[in-house]
Design a protein with these regions (language model features):
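Catalytic phosphate-handling regions of large nucleic-acid enzymes and associated NTPases
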Residues: 1-186
Length: 186
């Protein structure tokens, strides 16, 4: 048999904790910037590649997957982009991306149009949340020899409470409801 054998105890001591840690990074929003890994990759790509213009969601997802070495497929990123641009009641208090069509769902039907039909740009809030002078301090991560997005951003306002977050991961779950921005500031 040519397969490499591994002890079950080694799996539980090495592989399972490594998977759980990686899974938590993907599915639980960071308390520092309030973003999940995929959201951070999208925001980083928008800032670096599309600072002013609207871009087709499908194009953004493909460019983001290549630019940040996203391992889970551009189709997943397209859904995240569309969700970040939803502006109806009950979706986001303040969307970080702005959509230019009505294809981002509604309160009655929250599903978005396919990524090939929607276009997004940075919202004015996103531009004011992340200060470009922080870039030199934060630094970028290195993945397989390539510089990718930062480990976290440092927004001027706690975005985790602004739009909330929910996630289910290995050993952890997160359900943070959005808060009133006026109550957070005071």
């Amino acid at each position: 048999m040519g397969a490499k054998q591994k002890l079950v105890s080694d799996f539980f001591k090495v592989d399972l904790p490594a998977y759980g840690s990686y899974d938590n990074i993907r599915k639980i929003a960071s308390y520092v910037d309030g973003f999940k890994n995929s959201q951070r990759k999208i925001i980083f790509t928008m800032i670096k590649k599309y600072p002013k213009d609207y871009v087709k969601t499908e194009t953004l997802a493909n460019v983001c997957a290549a630019f940040t070495n996203y391992l889970h497929g551009a189709a997943n990123l397209g859904g995240v982009v569309n969700t970040m641009a939803q502006s109806f009641v009950g979706a986001n208090n303040y969307p970080l991306l702005t959509g230019n069509s009505g294809g981002f769902g509604s309160r009655i039907t929250p599903t978005c149009a396919a990524s090939r039909y929607t276009r997004v740009a940075q919202s004015s809030l996103l531009k004011s949340l992340l200060v470009s002078t922080d870039d030199a301090i934060i630094g970028q991560q290195l993945f397989e020899g390539d510089l990718i997005e930062p480990k976290y951003f440092v927004p001027v306002f706690p975005t985790l409470f602004l739009n909330g977050s929910s996630g289910l991961s290995t050993g952890f779950s997160q359900d943070i409801l959005p808060r009133n921005p006026d109550e957070i500031i005071t």
